[in-house]
């Protein structure tokens, strides 16, 4: 089955901006995330497809390769990150064609001789954050299996005490000439593999100049990050061969759903249930309702003649974005819990009860209302613990 176009997967045009691509990714990632679709293999596949599309289209080099060559740009074992918690990047797309045409025509690379040691692959680490961690910033310790510099040979790949010798097959050129009829074809030297030198391999890294190790890193996540944001740690990817520089590590952020707040940009949204009695009282007299924020509980003044479903904006109670732009707002929606199937006597008693409370009838036996305030209590207990 052929792969779908990455732009089609995200539902954006080919000239879409990075902001539009990120917005589309966030919407689809939330829709198909495994936490929301447990046991649904179709949703899991779509989530992977959406994530792959986002990673390609937000990387300038990979996007350029895809725009020119389509999926063929990543079918040679390079391009793109692997799955799981982290993954390795492949060879640069330009190098794929450099290898092919360089071998045939004896050019391709500058100098047409010894191969340069390749920079190490980039890695990706997927990090899940709570909303509180994303908003305030946090330091996280992570473990990343990778290839690191070999201390035994100091990255040279040669056995300690030995030195590199000129390859006798290609005489240090890194290439050999093969005659086929009337044609002379230059190919990578099979003895030194294009390096021009022969070494006695290091026992620790087997001549690669690098070895497998799990690194422990302390990653500082800046305040205000959101799902889809990516943090680059320069030089923390795989070490290159034979002393070549290391690649980079990209930390991909995913913010978990919150049981009270929903984030959209730098704004937060919250639904606050109020009892039927309290709603009636506030509609006539106005009043106050307690609202949770990221900084603690605050009282929201509700004017008279307030109807059910009205939205209130609490300025400066949202998120300070990682890219600036000021602090967002908290948008509060009052949801009235209406009792049903009341008899005439019950309605009369309800009215008397409201009057006896002096108009402050915030108490409710509704389970949704109880659940909300229990959730608020847990939220603030977690903040102070």
Swiss-Prot record:
Record's keyword terms, sorted: Chaperone, Cytoplasm, DNA replication, Metal-binding, Repeat, Stress response, Zinc, Zinc-finger
Pfam family, one: DnaJ_CXXCXGXG
Cofactor: Zn(2+)
Alphabetized SUPFAM superfamilies for the sequence: Chaperone J-domain (SSF46565), DnaJ/Hsp40 cysteine-rich domain (SSF57938), HSP40/DnaJ peptide-binding domain (SSF49493)
Positions that bind Zn(2+) 1: 150, 153, 202, 205
PROSITE patterns listed in its UniProt record: DNAJ_1, DNAJ_2, ZF_CR
Gene3D superfamilies per the UniProt record, alphabetical: DnaJ domain, Heat shock protein DnaJ, cysteine-rich domain, Urease metallochaperone UreE, N-terminal domain
Compartments where found: Cytoplasm
Subunit-structure text: Homodimer.
NCBIfam families referenced in this protein's UniProt entry, alphabetically: DnaJ_bact, PRK10767.1
Purpose of the protein: Participates actively in the response to hyperosmotic and heat shock by preventing the aggregation of stress-denatured proteins and by disaggregating proteins, also in an autonomous, DnaK-independent fashion. Unfolded proteins bind initially to DnaJ; upon interaction with the DnaJ-bound protein, DnaK hydrolyzes its bound ATP, resulting in the formation of a stable complex. GrpE releases ADP from DnaK; ATP binding to DnaK triggers the release of the substrate protein, thus completing the reaction cycle.
Domain-level remarks: The J domain is necessary and sufficient to stimulate DnaK ATPase activity. Zinc center 1 plays an important role in the autonomous, DnaK-independent chaperone activity of DnaJ. Zinc center 2 is essential for interaction with DnaK and for DnaJ activity.
HAMAP family linked: DnaJ
Annotated protein name in UniProt: Chaperone protein DnaJ
The organism of origin for this protein: Vibrio harveyi (Beneckea harveyi)
Organism classification: Bacteria, Pseudomonadati, Pseudomonadota, Gammaproteobacteria, Vibrionales
């Amino acid at each position: 089955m052929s792969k779908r176009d990455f732009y089609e997967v995200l539902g954006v045009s080919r000239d879409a901006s990075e902001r539009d691509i990120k917005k589309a990714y966030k919407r689809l990632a939330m829709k198909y995330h495994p936490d929301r679709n447990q046991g649904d293999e179709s949703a899991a596949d779509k989530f992977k497809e959406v994530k792959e599309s986002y990673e390609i289209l937000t990387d300038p080099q990979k996007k350029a390769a895809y725009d020119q060559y389509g999926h063929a740009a990543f079918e040679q074992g390079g391009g793109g990150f692997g799955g799981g918690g982290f993954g390795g990047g492949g060879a640069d797309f330009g190098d794929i064609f450099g290898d092919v045409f360089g071998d045939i025509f004896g050019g391709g690379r500058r100098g047409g001789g010894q191969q340069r040691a390749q920079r190490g692959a980039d890695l990706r680490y997927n990090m899940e954050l709570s909303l509180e961690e994303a908003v305030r910033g946090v330091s996280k310790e992570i473990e990343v299996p990778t290839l690191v510099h070999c201390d035994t040979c100091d990255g040279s790949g040669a056995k300690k005490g030995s030195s590199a010798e000129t390859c006798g097959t290609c005489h240090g050129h890194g290439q050999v000439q093969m005659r086929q009829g009337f044609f002379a074809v230059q190919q990578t030297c099979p003895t030194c593999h294009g390096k021009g030198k022969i070494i006695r391999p290091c026992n620790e890294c087997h001549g690669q100049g690098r070895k497998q190790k799990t690194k422990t890193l302390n990653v500082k996540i800046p305040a205000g990050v959101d799902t889809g944001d990516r943090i680059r740690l320069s030089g923390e990817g795989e070490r290159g061969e034979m002393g070549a520089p290391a690649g980079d590590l990209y930390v991909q952020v995913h913010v978990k759903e919150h049981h009270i707040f929903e984030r959209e940009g730098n704004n937060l949204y919250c639904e606050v249930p109020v009892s039927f009695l309290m709603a009636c009282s506030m509609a006539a007299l106005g009043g106050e309702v307690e609202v949770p924020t990221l900084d603690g509980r605050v009282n929201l003044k509700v004017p008279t003649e307030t109807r059910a479903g009205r939205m209130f904006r609490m300025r400066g109670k949202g998120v300070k974005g990682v890219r600036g732009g000021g602090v967002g707002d908290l948008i509060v929606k009052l949801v009235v819990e209406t009792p049903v199937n009341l008899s005439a006597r019950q309605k009369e008693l309800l009215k008397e009860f409201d009057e006896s409370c002096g108009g402050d009838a915030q108490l409710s036996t509704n389970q949704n209302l109880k659940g909300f305030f229990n959730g608020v209590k847990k939220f603030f207990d977690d903040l102070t613990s």
